[in-house]
UniProtKB/Swiss-Prot annotation:
This is UPF0354 protein BCG9842_B0431. NCBIfam families: PRK13668.1. It comes from Bacillus cereus (strain G9842). Belongs to the UPF0354 family. InterPro entries: DUF1444.
């Protein structure tokens, strides 16, 4: 059987049929939206991507997507009822892993220097989610992660920019407590990548700033290093004094690149 986007839409609608959910199908964009009837919050599924996975994994691909959508929508509903938002926050890898003995925080690895934690934010109170709180929320770790990333993508952004020695620096500093969190917004990073002509360098020196730089020469690397160190020293919640080159969805710490460059130079001289 040849799988098409239309057939995949029908398969997913069968798997996800629930009285409290609605479906909307955009045949032009080949996107299926599944949303809650009451809140109108939902998930968009790009069908060609699921079809490509189906070509490899068959029924398992459909099961995985259906599970992801179901978990995310259930988490959204619980969050809606609790009156609080779950958002990811970036912290240093040296940040404590436990709220107290025997009660670890819910965490996800991010880069060699950073880790993702999850905050329950009700505007009045802000608390990092640990295992005990997770049980009270009646959520799974996966639901928390899906919900947090969904909410992170909804955070607005407006950059200020400055150009020094041909290098352009973009600063995000809304002071909403989640500026560094925007580093998790893949579509934001991709849109910046498209407008950048040189190396794309990203830094989160503390929780209230995100720096994205278009680096075209060695001076630019020196500037971003000094800038990141300065912000790191001044930050209320410091994260890392290192910046990262962003390429193909991966973050490479600058000091690793510098070491590699030195090794290459050494070989050439030898």
């Amino acid at each position: 059987m040849k799988m098409t986007s239309k057939k995949m839409k029908d398969e997913l609608m069968k798997k996800l049929s629930r009285p409290e959910w609605d479906f909307q199908y955009d045949s032009e964009k080949e996107v299926l939206r599944i949303e809650q009837k009451d809140s109108k919050k939902g998930i968009n599924v790009s069908l060609p991507g699921v079809v490509a996975k189906w070509e490899v994994n068959k029924e398992k691909a459909i099961e995985e997507v259906a599970y992801y959508v179901q978990e995310a929508l259930i988490a959204m509903h619980k969050e809606e009822n609790s009156g609080a938002k779950i958002l990811p926050v970036i912290r240093s890898t040296s940040f404590p892993k436990q709220a107290e003995e025997g009660n670890p925080f819910i965490m996800t690895d991010h880069t060699a220097e950073t880790r993702i934690y999850y905050a329950l934010d009700s505007n009045k109170t802000y608390r990092l989610i640990d295992e005990r709180l997770l049980q009270k929320l009646e959520l799974t770790e996966q639901q928390v992660r899906e919900m947090a990333l969904f909410n992170a993508r909804s955070l607005g952004y407006e950059f200020k920019q400055d150009t020094v020695a041909g290098n352009t620096f973009y600063f995000l500093n809304t002071n909403d407590g989640y500026d560094a969190t925007r580093i998790l917004n893949e579509s934001l990073l991709q849109s910046m990548r498209e407008k950048i002509s040189g190396d794309m360098v990203v830094a989160v020196p503390h929780q209230d700033v995100l720096i994205i730089a278009d680096i075209v020469n060695e001076i630019g690397y020196d500037i971003i290093a000094q800038m990141t160190m300065k912000f790191f020293a001044e930050g209320h919640v410091p994260i890392t004094s290192l910046s990262f080159v962003y390429e193909d969805g991966e973050f490479e710490p600058i000091f690793i690149l510098a070491k590699n460059r030195k090794k290459t130079d050494g070989k050439e001289k030898g």
